[in-house]
Design a protein with these regions (language model features):
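Acidic/histidine-rich catalytic cores of soluble enzymes
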Residues: 149-231
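C-terminal segment of N-terminal export signals and the immediately downstream linker at the start
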Residues: 17-43, 47
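Acidic-and-aromatic substrate-binding clefts and catalytic sites of carbohydrate-active enzymes
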Residues: 46-51, 69-80, 96-104, 125-133, ...
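C-terminal helical cap(s) of enzyme catalytic domains, especially alpha/beta-barrels
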Residues: 260-275
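Active-site acidic/histidine proton-transfer and metal-coordination neighborhood
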Residues: 74, 95-185
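Acidic (Asp/Glu)-rich catalytic clusters
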Residues: 29-34, 57-62, 76-92, 103-116, ...
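N-terminal export signals
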Residues: 1-22
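Hydrophobic faces of well-ordered beta-strands that scaffold small-molecule active sites
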Residues: 36-41, 68-70, 92-97, 119-121, ...
Length: 275
């Protein structure tokens, strides 16, 4: 799973060796990520968008991106932002959209205007299992409304969902208290590792529900790294998780020094990657 010994040592809590389906070799080598499944989470470039929204969208298109995952519309209406995406030949294939306390019908109408058919709740955190269960109930209800409108709504993890609360992991509460028909999972692979879990084992634990990957690398110091420059063995991970539904592979870095360089490094690495 890791490309260096230091990376493996840093990930204390991961299983030393993957077993069962995690060891399976899914056929031929040499696959590549189809470009239509390659995207970037625009949160990575949030500081640039605040200074120059159009110029940054154009720069992403020049790198080669054709799909993006939204994280807000930076003061524009859904229609205005859609026109900007169209101008630079970009397509919103997914978005992070909070539902708690929001008018879900309005969120759905905006999604239809912007054109995406996958959305996810970006964050939740609670201290008790009762709160997590109540959240899962609200999530399922909102996701059912999205589903009826033709949009798949999911949950995006951080690390804390993989750490037990009173003996139960919140990620398991979310998965077991929502319907697979309503709620898919968007696994942020950096945070899965940071939470002490094995991404491949977690993928097969919820096989069929994981429909999006946040492709975020982990440096030897445990911090964020540009995709392909850190310790996660992406070729092995993607090869072992190839089975199942078509997935979106979404480049992300939470705090890049040079967001456009990060975007280019991630795009070039994933386009060239063979597994």
């Amino acid at each position: 799973m890791f490309r260096t010994a230091a990376g493996a040592v840093a990930a204390v809590g991961l299983a030393g060796a993957m077993s069962g389906t995690a060891h399976a070799d899914w056929g031929r080598r040499g696959r590549r990520i189809p470009r239509q499944q390659l995207s970037i989470q625009l949160y990575t470039l949030r500081n640039l968008f605040e200074a120059d929204l159009e110029g940054t969208l154009e720069a992403l298109a020049d790198i080669g991106y054709r799909s993006v995952e939204l994280a807000g519309t930076y003061g524009r209406s859904a229609a205005e932002f859609r026109r900007l995406l169209d101008r630079y030949h970009l397509r919103a294939t997914s978005a992070h959209v909070s539902f708690d306390g929001e008018d879900v019908d309005t969120l759905i109408e905006d999604a239809k205007i912007l054109g995406y058919r996958k959305a996810a709740c970006a964050y939740a955190n609670y201290s008790t299992l009762a709160e997590w269960r109540a959240f899962a109930d609200r999530l399922d209800k909102a996701a059912a409304a999205f589903r009826r409108a033709g949009i798949s709504y999911g949950y995006h993890n951080h690390d804390h969902e993989f750490r037990a609360v009173d003996g139960v992991r919140p990620i398991d509460v979310i998965a077991e208290h929502t319907s697979p028909r309503n709620v898919h999972l968007e696994y942020d692979l950096y945070w899965v590792v940071e939470g002490g879990a094995d991404p491949v084992e977690e993928y097969y634990r919820r096989f069929g529900r994981v429909q999006q990957f946040h492709v975020k690398d982990r440096g030897e110091d445990g911090g964020w790294a540009d995709v392909g420059t850190g310790t996660i063995d992406w070729a092995s991970l993607f090869r072992r998780t190839w089975a199942g539904p078509m997935k979106q592979y979404i480049v992300e870095h939470d705090d890049p020094a040079d967001p456009l360089d990060t975007a280019k490094v991630g795009y070039d690495y994933l386009v060239d990657l063979r597994f």
